[in-house]
A protein has these predicted regions:
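Anion-binding alpha/beta catalytic cores of soluble intermediary-metabolism enzymes, centered on
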Residues: 1-143
Length: 143
């Protein structure tokens, strides 16, 4: 609320839900609201990943048969487009097949947010294929 006031942002059309101070209980409340159709998107904020993911992957949470992945969207003051990074948090060592699933999840999420015509970069530590660096081999296979 302080940030909204400082930035002179109107919260008139925003419902603020008071949640418990316990991050896991707050996440459970958010997951329940998604299941009820009251929320369309979960935002992580400053929660620890395990506090967020526990209620999501619980059998009564939001788990589906699809791979769960993470999408981080951000703006740079000196760049004209929104940028996204996936999956830097949930899937620790994905193979090329799993990376394709993660990419598909991200593209679907962006489309739901109204972001179409997405450009994708498969990033590794170097821009050339290195047979000793699996991420470069995967990038070549995905592209």
């Amino acid at each position: 609320l302080e940030l909204a006031a400082t930035e002179e942002l109107s919260l008139d059309d925003i419902e603020i839900v008071d949640t418990p101070k316990d991050p896991i209980l707050a996440t459970k409340k958010a997951v329940e609201m998604v299941k009820q159709g009251k929320l369309a998107v979960l935002m992580k904020g400053s929660l620890h990943t395990e506090d967020l993911m526990g209620p999501i992957v619980h059998r009564d949470g939001l788990r589906t048969d699809k791979r769960i992945s993470h999408l981080f969207l951000f703006e740079l003051a000196r760049y004209h487009k929104l940028l996204g990074v996936t999956d830097a948090v949930v899937n620790i060592a994905p193979d090329a097949k799993l990376k394709r699933e993660i990419l598909a999840n991200s593209l679907a999420a962006l489309k739901k947010l109204g972001i179409n015509n997405t450009k994708v970069a498969i990033i590794a530590a170097t821009e050339v294929i290195n047979p000793t660096m699996q991420s470069t081999i995967d990038a070549k296979e995905i592209v």
